[in-house]
C-alpha cells in the first residue's frame, strides 16, 4: 500500500551493495567481517541505506528447498548494516545482475517453466518471499522487499531465452509477490523494479501503468547506455537529466498524485563517460533528481568496483563503484559524500506548468513506447524544453483531456509531439 512522504522527511541516499570480495558470489560462503568492512566505508560516505541482492540460486536451489543457512545469512547482513546506521532494502529474485542470470535449475533447460506464469514457478517464488519476510520482518532497519532486480528482462524480446508475458500476466505475477511480501512483513513497504523496456519497448508485457501503480512506490532505473549517451553525449542535457526524465514520465501514469518515487538504480558507465566526467555526471544527475516532487531517495549503482580477478564481465561493470577495490572512496564516491549533506533536507520542487502529452490507449499503455525512448519525439520534446530553460512534466492523453486533472497538477500549457518520428527501442539492460 502506498504511504505518502511526510513533508519533512529527509531525502534518502544509498548504494546498491556489490560486495568488494567475490562480488555477488560472496553469498555462497558469507564473510561477515568483509561485509562489515564494506558497510563501514559506505557509512563514512554519509549513506543511510543499502540495497542487497542475495542470489536466488543460493536461497532456493530446489523449488521446495529454501535453505535456512542462506536465509540466516540475509538476516545477518541486514543486522550488520544496522551496526553502521544503514537501513536495508532486500531484493528477492536474483535473478539477473550485471549481465549474469542466476536461475535455479528447476526453472530452465529440462525443467523449463515460465517464471511469471507457471503455477509451480509462481508458488515457489511466493514461498521464498514469505520465508524471507518471516525472517526479516522484525528487523528495525529492514525497509522492505523489491520483488527482484529488473526481472522484466526475462520477458523481453531481446533476452536470449525469453519467458514472454502479457500485461495481465505481468500484473498477476507482481501482485502475487507483493501480496506475499505484505502478508509476511506487513510493517514494511514493498516494491517491484523494471529496466526501461517497460517505458520504451513496444509490446513489452511490463508497462508504465504497472510500474506506477503497483507497490508502495514507483522505482526508476536510469541508465544512459540505453542510447541516450550514444545519441546526445555522456554529459549532455539528455544524459544529465535522464533520471529526472524517467521520474517525471512515471508520474504521468500514477493514479495517486502523491505517490512516492524511488530512483533505485542509476550509475555512471565507462562506455559513456570518461573517469574525469563521472563525478560531474553524478552531481548533475542527483541535483536534477532531487528537484522532483515526492522523491523518496536515490540509490547509486553501485557500492564497490568489481575485482578484475573475476572474468567475463562487460568492461563497464568493473568500474561502476563509489569505492575502489583498495577500499578507498573514488572521486565519484567523494563527490557523492560532498553533496549529500546539502541535499538531504527536502526543498520545494519547481513548478512544472508545461506538460508533454503521452498518447495512450484505453488501457493507459502508450500507443508508441518507442516515442518515449532516446531519440523518440516525446524524448526529444523533453530535451528541447529543458534546453530552452523549462522544467517540463508529462501527462497522458487521458489527463490532457481533463481540465480538472490538468489544473490539479498546475499544468497550463501542453505540447503534443508528432509520433511519426518514433523509433524502435531494442536496448538491453546490460552491455555484453
Predicted feature descriptions by range:
Residues 1-49, 64, 79-83, 87, ...:
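N-terminal carbohydrate-binding accessory modules
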Residues 15, 42, 50, 81, ...:
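Conserved, mostly hydrophobic/aromatic
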Residues 20-32, 56-72, 109-124, 160-170, ...:
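The substrate-binding groove and active-site-proximal loops of carbohydrate-active enzymes
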Residues 27-43, 125-133, 198-211, 279-288:
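Short, acidic/polar
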Residues 32-107, 164-191:
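Aromatic-lined substrate-binding rim segments of carbohydrate-active enzymes
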Residues 48-56, 93-118, 126-165:
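Active-site groove signature of glycoside hydrolases
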Residues 125, 284, 288, 292-432:
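Aromatic-rich peripheral "rim/lid" segments of glycoside hydrolase catalytic domains that contact
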Residues 168-172, 176, 185-271, 305:
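Glycoside hydrolase catalytic-domain groove-lining segments
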Amino acid at each position: 500500500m502506498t504511504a505518502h512522504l511526510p513533508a519533512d522527511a529527509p531525502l534518502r541516499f544509498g548504494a546498491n551493495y556489490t560486495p568488494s570480495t567475490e562480488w555477488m558470489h560472496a553469498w555462497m560462503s558469507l564473510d561477515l567481517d568483509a561485509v562489515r568492512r564494506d558497510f563501514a566505508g559506505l557509512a563514512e560516505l554519509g549513506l543511510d541505506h543499502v540495497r542487497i541482492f542475495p542470489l536466488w540460486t543460493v536461497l532456493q536451489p530446489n523449488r521446495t528447498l529454501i535453505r535456512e543457512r542462506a536465509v540466516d545469512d540475509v538476516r545477518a547482513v541486514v543486522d550488520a548494516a544496522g551496526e553502521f546506521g544503514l537501513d536495508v532494502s532486500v531484493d528477492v529474485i536474483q535473478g539477473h545482475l550485471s549481465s549474469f542470470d542466476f536461475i535455479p535449475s528447476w526453472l530452465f533447460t529440462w525443467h523449463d517453466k515460465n517464471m511469471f506464469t507457471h503455477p509451480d514457478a509462481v508458488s515457489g517464488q511466493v514461498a521464498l518471499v514469505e520465508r524471507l519476510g518471516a525472517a526479516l520482518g522484525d528487523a528495525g532497519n529492514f525497509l522492505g522487499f523489491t520483488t527482484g532486480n529488473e526481472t522484466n528482462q526475462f520477458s523481453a524480446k531481446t533476452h536470449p531465452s525469453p519467458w514472454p508475458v502479457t500485461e495481465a500476466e505481468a500484473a498477476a505475477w507482481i501482485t502475487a509477490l507483493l501480496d506475499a511480501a505484505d502478508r509476511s512483513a506487513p510493517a514494511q513497504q514493498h516494491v517491484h523494479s523494471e529496466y526501461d523496456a517497460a517505458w520504451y519497448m513496444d509490446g513489452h508485457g511490463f508497462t508504465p501503468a504497472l510500474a506506477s501503480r503497483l507497490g508502495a512506490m514507483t522505482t526508476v532505473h536510469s541508465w544512459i547506455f540505453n542510447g541516450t549517451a550514444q545519441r546526445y553525449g555522456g554529459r549532455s542535457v539528455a544524459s544529465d537529466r535522464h533520471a529526472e526524465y524517467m521520474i517525471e514520465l512515471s508520474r504521468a501514469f500514477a493514479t495517486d498524485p502523491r505517490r512516492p518515487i524511488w530512483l533505485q538504480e542509476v550509475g555512471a558507465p565507462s562506455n559513456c563517460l570518461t573517469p574525469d566526467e563521472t563525478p560531474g555526471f553524478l552531481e548533475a544527475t542527483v541535483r536534477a533528481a532531487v528537484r522532483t516532487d515526492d522523491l523518496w531517495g536515490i540509490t547509486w549503482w553501485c557500492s564497490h568496483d568489481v575485482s578484475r580477478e573475476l572474468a567475463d564481465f562487460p568492461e563497464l561493470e568493473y568500474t561502476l563503484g563509489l569505492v575502489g577495490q583498495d577500499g578507498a572512496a573514488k572521486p565519484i564516491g567523494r563527490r557523492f559524500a560532498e553533496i549529500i549533506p546539502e541535499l538531504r533536507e527536502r526543498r520545494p520542487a519547481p513548478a512544472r506548468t508545461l506538460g508533454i502529452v503521452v498518447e495512450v490507449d484505453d488501457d493507459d499503455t502508450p500507443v508508441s513506447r518507442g516515442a518515449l525512448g532516446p531519440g523518440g519525439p516525446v524524448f526529444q520534446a523533453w530535451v528541447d524544453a529543458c534546453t530552452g530553460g523549462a522544467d517540463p512534466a508529462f501527462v497522458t492523453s487521458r489527463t490532457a483531456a481533463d481540465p480538472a486533472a490538468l489544473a490539479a497538477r498546475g499544468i497550463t500549457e501542453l505540447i503534443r509531439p508528432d509520433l511519426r518520428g518514433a523509433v524502435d527501442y531494442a536496448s538491453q539492460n546490460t552491455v555484453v
